[in-house]
Regions:
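A short amphipathic helical element positioned immediately N-terminal to and/or at the very start
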Residues: 4-18, 272-280
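Hydrophobic alpha-helical transmembrane segments of multi-pass inner-membrane transport and secretion
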Residues: 20-47, 56-92, 112-126, 206, ...
């Protein structure tokens, strides 16, 4: 019986004696189990499922569970490799005392079982306790009524248990693989093997600098939001690769360059710090690069999602400038003034009969096509277009001059063959406008305001073209498309207005209250049946919930992922300080023996730690500054164009993160000095 429990007791004793190493790992793993359970549970929450905007939030949260699952796999592999490296000497001693690798493997198995049981059990227990708090916070973000029913998601419990069981199994197999390839002598001498001097790697350093410069150039040079979306992933990958190259190779290359400067290097205040820094960066460059990337991810997520959440009402108003919008999709009926008057009177009668008053009416017709801008020509045939051509894609909304003047209250003049052009998220500077080389019109050089609403929802850049002869232009355009593509665009009649009705009577929000949106849909259903046209009604009040659901979900996910990434960064920094503390114990002793005082040594080490520790924060701040134009353009795709708000949220996010970072430095720095003091105080 004692033999059966021997390996479990050895595993538990080893973990308990190395609790300084294991405790952060256990806490981090339990935290990831907790976050995964909460996000998984919320994504299938019946509370979110039955509320307006909950569907958008659920999709976003499901994506978050995938991110946490992938990140947990990578991060736990990293922490476990550190633990194994620190305990190789202990395992080597077991081997010398008579244990075979099979026996050590059984110890590792028990350690994995204990780790899995502690972390998964603790994480799921805390998850069940904190789940309702997270659900209440999510509901508050969506600005919907709160329910206080306590629930436990069994499916989320099973999914979390299965996921982390698989991760710990993979970690165990990797540990056994490492153990199999090392001899007993190698295990015993693993911590005393001499370290080769780091070499300058100019090629890798130059590659990192070029990649970083290229990513920064993309960030500041791209002007169109859709192009920013296209190139964002590429820029992110370039920044990640460049950060690792510069931290691992660039920092060592810099130190080697300083060592070649004899006037600078051979001074007491520089000699020790520069030579030691080269070794530090060689050992810890990858870890510091990971911290820098995690810090950048946190800053980008928090600043952008906070900006979205705070400015969500601005986004709603940009997409829906008026309370309700009616659309009728037809052809000859909308070019016939009598038919147009008939449907207008029907809409107005429906509004009056419901008891509402209208104001701020905007009524206009449009016909829309898409194409690629080529100077002043719009190429409608996209066959053979490449990915780079997506930056030239535009959506073109054509409307009559009289409708535009009526909707904006202006009296703009136009002659035959002339047009006005307004651009949204696009640039158009040509003196002429043509469609596939035909229908050439002269562009009048005058800035005109863009009509909001449908064009604000376009992901692609938009051009609004005002023509004086809409009734003649539309048939010619439709005939051309019919001949070339066997299909043609249709005319859309827009009727948007504000009303004095309460919001729950404007749109179908709760599904039970009689509302104007349903009344208009009822009338337009008859129009659609009689005329064979398409109809739609959009309510700002009803669609506001979807906006809040999406932006609230992104904000909540940003907070949750930021917490996970911050804990991961703290764990990496903690393990870095531990490893450096153990490695510097003997160096302190040697420095004292060659004549340096403890005060000089502490000053030198403190200088190195400050440089190494704050370098990721400084570079993350630089990354954030260059990412700002990218973030701003991506937010425009979410109908939010508020540069001042984004600057504010970005500045506050960086300031708060910097304070937290400084606190972590203080705490982990104390751990480093305690480890070093354990050796020096014995002298």
């Amino acid at each position: 019986m004692r033999e059966k429990t021997l390996y479990a007791r050895l595993a538990w004793t080893g973990m308990r004696k190395n609790r300084r190493l294991y405790l952060p790992c256990l806490l981090s793993c339990a935290g990831m189990v907790l976050m995964f359970y909460i996000l998984m549970g919320l994504s299938g929450s019946p509370v979110l499922e039955h509320m307006s905007g909950g569907g958008s939030s659920a999709i976003i949260l499901r994506l978050g569970t995938v991110v946490i699952a992938v990140f947990a796999l990578i991060f736990l592999f990293y922490t476990h490799s550190f633990l194994i490296r620190r305990r190789e000497r202990e395992f080597g001693l077991y081997n010398v005392l008579g244990m075979g690798k099979g026996n050590i493997a059984r110890i590792l198995l028990w350690e994995t079982v204990i780790t899995y049981g502690l972390t998964t059990g603790t994480g799921l227990l805390l998850g069940m306790v904190l789940y309702k708090l997270a659900e209440l916070g999510m509901v508050r973000l969506l600005q919907v009524p709160v329910t206080y029913t306590l629930t436990v998601s069994v499916s989320s419990l099973l999914a979390a248990a299965a996921l982390f069981a698989a991760i710990h199994t993979l970690i165990l197999l990797n540990g056994l693989r490492q153990l199999h390839g090392v001899s007993a002598v190698g295990l015993l001498r693993s911590e005393s093997v001499g370290e080769k001097p780091p070499k300058a790697q100019w090629v890798l350093t130059a590659a990192g600098a070029v990649l970083l410069a290229g990513a920064y150039w993309l960030a500041v040079s791209i002007r169109e939001p859709l192009a920013a979306l296209t190139w964002f992933s590429a820029a992110v990958l370039m920044v990640i690769a460049a950060t690792y190259l510069l931290f691992i190779s660039g920092s060592v290359t810099l130190c080697r360059g300083l060592q070649r400067n004899k006037k600078y290097y051979y001074r007491p205040q520089h000699f020790v710090s520069v030579s030691s820094m080269a070794y530090r960066m060689k050992r810890n460059g990858a870890g510091l690069a990971s911290v820098c990337i995690l810090a950048t991810m946190v800053l980008v997520m928090i600043s952008s999602t906070t900006c979205l959440y705070v400015g969500q009402e601005d986004a709603v108003n940009a997409r829906y400038p008026r309370d309700l919008s009616v659309k009728v999709y037809g052809d000859r009926y909308l070019l016939d003034s009598e038919k147009l008057t008939q449907v207008r009177q029907g809409v107005e009668s429906t509004i009056f009969n419901f008891g509402g008053n209208v104001s701020n009416v905007a009524e206009y017709r449009t016909i829309s096509i898409s194409g690629l801008v080529d100077g002043g020509n719009i190429r409608t045939d996209s066959s053979g277009a490449s990915v780079s051509d997506s930056t030239r894609a535009v959506q073109i909304h054509i409307l009559p001059l009289e409708d535009y003047n009526a909707a904006t209250g202006q009296t703009l003049p136009l002659s035959d063959g002339q047009v006005y052009v307004a651009a949204l998220r696009a640039e158009f500077d040509s003196d002429t406008l043509s469609i596939d080389g035909g229908m050439i019109r002269h562009v009048m050089k005058r800035e005109i305001p863009m009509l909001g609403g449908p064009s604000a929802a376009d992901i692609t850049p938009s051009l609004m073209v005002v023509v004086p002869d809409f009734e003649q232009f539309v048939p010619a355009l439709q005939d051309y498309f019919m001949e070339k593509y066997r299909s043609y665009p249709t005319v859309v009649w827009h009727y948007a207005f504000d009303t004095d009705l309460p919001e729950n009577q404007q749109g179908n929000i709760d599904g039970t209250t009689p509302n104007l949106e349903d009344a208009l849909n009822g009338y337009l259903a008859g129009v659609s049946s009689d005329w064979g046209v398409g109809v739609s009604v959009e309510s700002k009040a009803a669609n506001r919930a979807d906006f809040y659901g999406m932006y609230g979900g992104l904000f909540f996910l940003g907070i949750m992922l930021s917490i996970v990434f911050i804990f991961a960064a703290v764990a990496i920094l903690y393990y870095k300080q531990l490893s450096e503390g153990y490695e510097d114990q003997s160096r302190f002793d040697i420095m004292q023996k060659v004549g340096m005082t403890k005060q000089d040594i502490r000053r030198s080490i403190n200088s190195q730690l400050l440089t190494v520790f704050y370098l990721p924060l400084v570079l993350a701040g630089v990354h954030l500054c260059f990412a700002f134009p990218f973030i701003h353009k991506l937010l425009i795709l979410f109908n939010l164009d508020n540069r001042g708000l984004l600057i504010g949220t970005t500045a506050v996010s960086f300031a708060v993160f910097a304070v937290l970072y400084a606190i972590v430095y203080k705490l982990t720095g104390n751990t480093y000095y305690r480890i070093v003091a354990e050796d020096t105080e014995k002298e």
